[in-house]
Amino acid sequence: MVSKYHRLLQQGLREEEEGVTERNMVAGGEQRHGHVDDDNAEGDADFYDQKDERRAKMWNPKHESANVSAGGKQNRSVRDCLPGSLPPVANTSTDAAVRFDRERKNAGHGVDISCVEGDGAQMGTYVSTGRSDAKAGGGSSAIGVTADDESDGNLDTDGSDASEGDEVESTTDADVYGEDDTTEGPRGGVRLYSCDACPHAVFTTHAALLAHAEEHHADLLPDHARLRRIAQKLNPVWNRALNARRNTITSWGKKIFHVAAQRDAGESKMQEAHRARAQLECVVRRWHDKARVFIFGSSVAMGVWDGTADIDFAVVDVDAMERGSWPPLEKNAVRSITELLRRVGFSFVNLEPISHARVPIIKHHASSPILTVARRDAEDVVARSIRFILNGPATREDRLLLEGSVRDAVGPTGVQQVWWNRTSDMMSATLESTTAAVRAAMCSPALASASLRTKVQPAHDECRPELYNIDFDLSFRAFGIRNSTLLRKYLLSHPCARPGAIVLKDWSKTSGVNNSVNGYFTSYAINIMWIYYLVQKGYVPYVDPLEIPESLVNYTDFDPRYTPMIDPEITNTEREELYKAAGDMLVGFFYFYSFEFDWGHNVISLNRPGITTKRMLGWHVEDVVPVASTSVSSGGGGSNVKRHPTRYELCIEDPYEENLNLGRHIGVTKSLRVRTELYRGLLSLLKEGETRSCVFAAADSSGTPAAGGKQSAALPARALFKLMALTTQAISESRRLPQSNSDNSGRIANGDNESLTEVGGGHRVEGAGVDPASCAGASLSSFGEPPIGVHEKTLESIFVEKAPMEFQLVRKVWNWHQLIHRLGYKIHRGHVMPRREVGVRCTARRDAEETTTELASGVDTTKSLRPGRGLTDTMLRDLSRGYMTLTPEWVAWSAPWVSQHLRGYSRLTTVRSAVADETPPALATVPSVVKPPTGEAVMGAMRTTRRNAAPARRVELLKLWLWRGISKVTPFKSPR
């Protein structure tokens, strides 16, 4: 490959020499003629300069400088800038100084532009170059200074701040960046610098690369020059600024701990992560019986889990890794485990296998966005229940075999309840734990009928095992386990280390610095930067990465131990000291990477206690991908695999993976943006009189409360459940409203054989009586608004008044119609009602018929006792109480929608005592459901079985109907 480029460069050099020879011959001919005037000679010179402009500009900084000042464009090609086509350069640093000298005045404009360097030059300060004059006849200087810069922070650009006692020192960009323009390449040639925004732009000097980035990609760096210049004014007076902003820095430290306290959801949340790991291991062991699941990532390094962040899992066979045969073929492993997860009820939409990445993983996005604070008893019962759905009715042998398969998977004592539906095509089971539920779901069901197929899923859409309700990433490499253990050892060595790491992670995500998809840093790299700063400043002791064993044979921390974010035993005095230290550490982080760290020569590394340079690791030479292999679609001569150049602009060494730069995708343009965000964060933390900073933008936008601590206990187990209860209560109350209080309700008055009836829209009908058949045949809508519905505006006002926090939470996820649908209702003519209210309508119509008949016959309805009277009201009220208390009676082992519980109403309530007093002896012998102290219903002789309640309820209704018919003929008076 080198010989190929060498031939191309020699050809380019010959073309250059031919152009120079031709130009000299023409110039010599003009001198011999002697009659060319000065204007024509100057014009010819400009013509030949323009002719050779492209070739000269690519390799000679002097030509480049002259061309930019003359207004020429820099259109470069890879061929013209590769090594070999360049003549020997005597002093490239001098050429760079001519192009980028900040003290050099612009002759065309007379503007004196200087930069205050102070101590930054000695500490490896990063300063990017401003744009030169783009046009020779332009009206303003273009070194990155604009008119609005003068008003930012009241900072001048004429060096007037030198009166503070700090010497104004001018340096060239080559000195500031610390780059050696004569660095040798991989095989003794000149080092190349490529642009990350232009795939075909390659340069031989770092100064030329910076000039190219600032001139052609200035739209990607809108604030870089301004923020850099303001931050440099702060550098010479750094100690004075810290003393002046002491109270502000302490307030930031207090906010750091408040933000960190919100991420600590307590030990119970960490135990949920432990159970999720055990459940995932049950699934993985169906694929590989010796595989173990490990937790790594932030939950291990921080020692806490907030319940919302994703969890990183690693599948490792420890014995195979010791033999050197792990990981397996990761693409096949991703497909196999994805299929197993989908088999146990994971959604195709929420489960995303990524098999073609550098590290193949499986990503899971939880379907329920409503967060859980505490799981109640009823939710726990439903969460450890699963459902087997068959494609046909099962015989007695099929039932026995399927139940036996479940018991064999979890043990004889692992199953608490098993019940079948009426059609024998669905079996549900409640296990002793959620982990046992997943283990039962992974069993191989045995069936006697060859045509039967089973599908297993959780018994509930919301209350499921912990693995279904968390976001997680599953990989097959053990690097993360060792890395997380190392980070945990560092972060637990100082009480301010973990809170600071959390704030910096939020800042990096909101600022765009933490965006690995677009080629920036990862959260792991940000943590390495934070720890490296703490080690260099002496906040935490150095830990040798080799102290963490590579082998996992003796590894026992499968479930990371919970460590509170804030020690509950610290005193108020100690807390104030921690606030002060945390603020100093956070501000010092931004100052360290803005001015002190030498990005040009050094590497952020935890492998050595001292300073690591790029030359020590061989990272001072950039790997430039040849043109033919930059893309798969570049032609038939390219490589079949797309390659990306490994860049060493910003270097972060991985502690364990050899020769891995965590910033390998960050080129010059992205590096300038990273440094811009560092400047921005530093200035926002030190700005006087401000209570908001871009560093805490994530906490401010999410509405983090000012006081630390866990989430409020006022938030119910799930926000949807409280809204369900309020909706059901509102519908029940609307049905119980007196008929006279509604404008559209019918009023019936009885007296002296005359009645006045006002129906619906106010039409009056007079007569000797009311025809019961006409009222009985009337539709429910003829009596005004639906008896079981509530108006949309009324329901919304109830939500805002009684559950504002829950209503605001769910509206961030769904719109109004989606929310009503999630609650199990529908909107009909502006009213909210259950989606399937056929049974309720029949009951309500029957009550209306009886009321009309009794009014027509002159019977006092207040004195008549009917067991079925008010059944709709009682049903809805009891159902709402079930939603509010979340008892197993209302759950009914199915989705928690109102429409699916109305037919099984006997599971929700028992016969009222008032009705029981008037019940005839024949009906009183019907056994009622006895509720044990544990809260679980006892059905039948065996506790492990439960018969369906719907047939029993139909028998009760049939007997009640017969008794009602008999009582109309011969009134029955029960003994008092």
From Swiss-Prot:
**EC number from the UniProt entry:** 2.7.7.52
UniProt protein name: Terminal uridylyltransferase 1
**What residues does the PAP-associated domain cover?**
366-425
Q: Which InterPro entries did the record assign?
A: MTPAP-like_central, NT_sf, PAP_assoc
Zn finger spans (C2H2-type): 190-221
Motif range (Nucleotide recognition motif (NRM)):
652-661
GO cellular component term of the entry, any:
mitochondrion
Instruction: Identify the coding gene.
Output: KRET1
Q: PROSITE patterns recorded for this chain?
A: ZINC_FINGER_C2H2_2 (PS50157)
Q: What is its main location?
A: mitochondrion
- Renumbered residue ranges of the record's region Required for oligomerization and may contribute to the incorporation into the MPsome complex: 1-188
- Region annotated Important for catalytic activity and RNA binding sits at 700-976
Q: Which organism is it from?
A: Trypanosoma brucei brucei
